[in-house]
Curated annotation (Swiss-Prot):
Cross-link (Cyclopeptide (Gly-Asn)): 1-30
Keyword Disulfide bond applies: yes
Disulfide bonds: 4-20, 8-22, 13-27
GO terms under cellular component: extracellular region
Coiled-coil regions listed in the entry: none
Native organism: Clitoria ternatea
Protein name: Cyclotide cter-P
Top-rank taxon, per record: Eukaryota
Family as reported in the entry's similarity comment: Belongs to the cyclotide family. Bracelet subfamily.
Location relative to the cell: Secreted
Main location: secreted
PTM note: This is a cyclic peptide.
Physiological role: Probably participates in a plant defense mechanism.
GO terms classed as biological process: defense response
Amino acid sequence: GIPCGESCVFIPCITAAIGCSCKSKVCYRN
């Protein structure tokens, strides 16, 4: 539930490497 400061509209979350995932076009962690 914490925004990772990255969007995932056109590309996947690079922050997935630290546990972020794409939700509602924004990368979130927990």
